[in-house]
Design a protein with these regions (language model features):
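Hydrophobic/aromatic beta-strand patches that form the interior of the parallel beta-sheet core
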Residues: 13, 51-53, 101-103
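A glycine- and Lys/Arg-enriched "phosphate-lid" helix/loop adjacent to the NTP-binding pocket
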Residues: 16, 21-87
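Phosphate-binding/switch loop-helix module in NTP-utilizing enzymes
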Residues: 1-12
Length: 133
């Protein structure tokens, strides 16, 4: 689905891709990041993003911001697991600096929006508007 869209000139935005697989299964899940990245590379035929934005926040703060009371299977895992997932995303970004950017997500929604917009503008040569709040 992704590759044909890219090949036809469509811009694809994903909220989960290789970094999530590496962080959840490889780093926090114990399979090892090198094994998971090898399998992901095989499955995606080496496809990598132009830009990966890692919105970094302490999991405890993230859970306080979560809307609704229902937790899914992953959200019910212990805090240690979520800390490992966070470290997994940061590790992935560190290993892929050419296309990765870590953004502090501990500010207000407007502040995080502006950080994301500024990085996207710089890295992708765009001219998106910031909220400026």
């Amino acid at each position: 689905v992704v590759k044909p869209a890219i090949d036809s000139g469509i811009t694809v935005v994903c909220d989960r891709f290789a970094s999530a697989t590496s962080a959840y299964q490889g780093y926090a899940g114990g399979l090892g990041t090198s094994t998971v990245e090898w399998l992901t590379d095989l499955a995606t035929d080496g496809l990598l993003p132009n830009l990966l934005l890692v919105l970094d926040i302490d999991p405890a703060i993230g859970f306080l911001r979560k809307k609704g009371d229902t937790l899914d299977r992953i959200e019910r895992k212990p805090t240690d697991f979520h800390q490992m997932v966070r470290q997994g995303f940061l590790y992935y970004a560190e290993q892929h600096p050419d296309f990765s950017e870590v953004i502090a997500a501990d500010g207000t929604l407007a502040e995080v929006h502006d950080r994301v917009t500024q990085v996207a503008n710089e890295r992708l040569n765009l001219n998106l508007s910031v909220l400026g709040l």
